Amino acid sequence: MIIIKNLEITYPGKRKVKAVDNVSLEIKKGEIFGIIGLSGAGKSSLLRAINGLVRPTSGEVWVDGVEITRLSSKELLNLRQKIGMIFQHFNLLDSRTVFGNVAFPLEIGGYPREQIKKRVMEVLELVGLLDKAESYPRELSGGQKQRVGIARAIAANPKILLCDEPTSALDPQTTGQILKLLAEINQKLGITIVIITHEMRVITEICDRVAVMDNGRVVEEGVVTDVFLNPWHPITKEFVNTVISKELPEEVLAHARTRRPDREVLLLRFAGNTANEPVVSRIIKETGVELSILYGNIGHLKDVPYGILAVEIFGDENRRDKVRQILHELSVKLEVV
């Protein structure tokens, strides 16, 4: 659906700024793809290159089979009809009602009046604002304003929805509601969603895959569970530690440092179906080792369960080798602490 090849974006001036530095990505049709990074990482520039709002210095951007950097202004306008966009600060027209805001892109597109009315009411029902059709933005909460922004963005049936920090101005409860709505829209309409954010919650709750940006570059990319359960880049580890703490408490580390030949402290990481397996009981039953749980952390990445467990095992070397064999069979990753 979206292919980015060797993209570079440099802003001219007395001191040139390279906002995007040799980025290549492929975003699949129908997925929710997250791009996370700190302020100034290049996320917004990359997002704006996808709909042609920013012309790259070099590289290619393919959208739905079309290389958009070569398009004329008229061709680019036609392409943008396939792309909806929602913003951090809503960007609603204060002089228009909710209905009028959602109708605006359809009016510009020359849709017949009856078709506009029908479509606006459809999307307002989808976002849960049918009863607010005649209200003005000043009468709405932040979450309701963002729902209007989402309705406006999908009114013309786009294939792609670009989301620029859509929850950063919202409280935690409203953030959860907006994320749930975006996931529902993705499932019901099959729209490909690209969402940039600096909030880990956005990535862990709704994204299928993620790219981590730092200083204009993509430093890690992949399935959310793979990237965030096994991060290697320092910036990724910083983000992960805000929601998935893999830093063991000092008392556990101190305990692990008191070495004995008949015991080991292991850090186990597992995800998916393995997270629901009786791993500990199987180890004890099949190996005869004594096992103590020192630390644990469980949760979900989107709809995938994960677990992190620090355990201490007591037994001879042969039994401990059998423990490792079982963990390998179950695809549980282990690290000796």
UniProtKB/Swiss-Prot annotation:
Subcellular localization: Cell membrane
Alphabetized Pfam families for the sequence: ABC_tran (PF00005), NIL (PF09383)
Principal location listed in the UniProt entry: membrane
UniProt keyword annotation of Cell membrane present: yes
EC number(s) on file: 7.4.2.11
InterPro entries from the UniProt entry: AAA+_ATPase, ABC_transporter-like_ATP-bd, ABC_transporter-like_CS, ACT-like_dom_sf, MetN_ABC, MetN_ABC_transporter-like, NIL_domain, P-loop_NTPase
GO cellular component: plasma membrane
Family named by the database record: Belongs to the ABC transporter superfamily. Methionine importer (TC 3.A.1.24) family.
Descriptive protein name: Methionine import ATP-binding protein MetN
Biological source species: Carboxydothermus hydrogenoformans (strain ATCC BAA-161 / DSM 6008 / Z-2901)
